[in-house]
């Protein structure tokens, strides 16, 4: 057992934090290899610490031994096949999301001993806006700059073509299920009406040189008048043409469309978020009441985290090139 220095209570040697007061437990030669991260699912409002697999250049080229793979998977509370998929993609991806920095450091140290190099990226990374991306509804374009409009009333944000550094493209998928149930005397409710809606739209985050918060364009919430004669009838066509046009005008900006190919691996650590909403009770007729509910599953936060991760490594590479 390990004694907590704060509350003086005994804790199992596998714990990182005190079971009673949450203080960090002291390490010694005996417990350093016994500690195991809890890696509990975080609430929506909690800020976590992400262990990110480093690019292939930072990891040995040989295949991970089966025993090491199973040990790493057990540490991360993942099926070995899921961890193998993450490693096979050979790109920076999350393998764990911890509630505390000490837990993330433990994961980093233990994975490093198995030959898997990682780094820690906090949700609340310096410069990250908690409000999310700046959503752009329309663009004005000339030879030197872009004029981004967030609302018809707000003044345009002026962005020089030379300021664009990264375009991250993905898909936003929202599944919405609406239920109307009749409450009965029995345990089970009778479903009166059920509807399911799915939206799937292309999204692009535009990162600029001096701002960490991206400008976001979504296909179904954008006025494509800036395309002029290139504008088509379908939003899915127009968003592709807009992205091509932006890349033509800013060829120096890095283009990343890897989100769709790694989305399955992201689900293991950054799953789509579910929101449950109740529309309340309604009296249908005397003695009969119904209740409505809405369940919405969205990958918007998943894409935002991945977009910020790509920008994190883009900025890191730029700093390394400047020092070289």
What are these regions (language model features)?
Residues 165-324:
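Acidic, Ser/Thr- and proline-rich intrinsically disordered linker/docking segments
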Residues 44, 48-60, 106-140:
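A cross-kingdom feature marking charged/low-complexity
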Residues 8-12:
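Short, flexible, mixed-charge glycine/proline-rich loop motifs
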Residues 22-32:
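Short Cys/His-rich micro-motifs in 6-15 aa windows
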Residues 1, 15:
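Residues immediately within or flanking Cys/His clusters that coordinate Zn2+
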Residues 4-7, 18-21:
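Short cysteine-rich clusters marking metal-coordination/redox-active sites
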Residues 32-98:
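Long, charge-rich boundary regions
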Residues 141-148, 157-176:
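Phosphoinositide-dependent membrane-docking surfaces
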């Amino acid at each position: 057992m390990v004694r907590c220095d704060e509350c003086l209570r005994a804790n199992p040697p596998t714990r990182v934090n005190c079971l009673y007061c949450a203080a960090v437990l002291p390490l010694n030669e005996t417990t350093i290899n016994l500690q195991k991260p809890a890696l509990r699912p975080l609430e929506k409002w909690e800020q976590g610490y992400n262990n990110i697999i480093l690019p292939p250049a930072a990891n040995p080229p040989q295949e991970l031994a089966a025993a090491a793979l199973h040990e790493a998977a057990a540490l991360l509370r993942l099926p070995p096949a899921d961890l193998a998929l993450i490693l096979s993609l050979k790109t920076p991806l999350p393998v764990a999301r911890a509630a505390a920095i000490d837990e993330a450091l433990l994961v980093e140290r233990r994975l490093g001993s198995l030959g898997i190099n990682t780094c820690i990226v906090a949700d609340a990374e310096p410069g990250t806006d908690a409000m999310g991306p700046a959503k752009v509804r329309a663009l004005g374009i000339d030879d030197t700059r872009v004029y981004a409009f967030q609302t018809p009333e707000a003044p345009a944000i002026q962005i020089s073509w030379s300021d664009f550094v990264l375009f991250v493209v993905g898909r936003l998928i929202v599944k919405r299920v609406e239920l109307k149930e009749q409450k009965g005397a029995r345990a089970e409710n009778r479903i009166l009406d059920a509807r399911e809606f799915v939206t799937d739209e292309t999204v692009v985050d535009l990162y600029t040189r001096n701002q960490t918060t991206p400008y976001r364009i979504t296909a179904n919430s954008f006025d494509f008048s800036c395309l002029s004669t290139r504008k088509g009838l379908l939003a899915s066509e127009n968003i592709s043409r807009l992205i091509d046009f932006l890349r033509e005008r800013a060829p120096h900006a890095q283009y990343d469309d890897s989100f769709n190919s790694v989305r399955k691996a992201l689900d293991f650590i950054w799953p789509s978020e579910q929101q449950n909403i109740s529309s309340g009770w309604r009296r249908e007729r005397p003695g009969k009441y119904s209740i409505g509910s809405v369940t919405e599953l969205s990958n918007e936060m998943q894409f935002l985290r991945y977009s910020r991760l790509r920008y994190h490594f883009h900025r890191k590479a730029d700093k390394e090139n400047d020092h070289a």
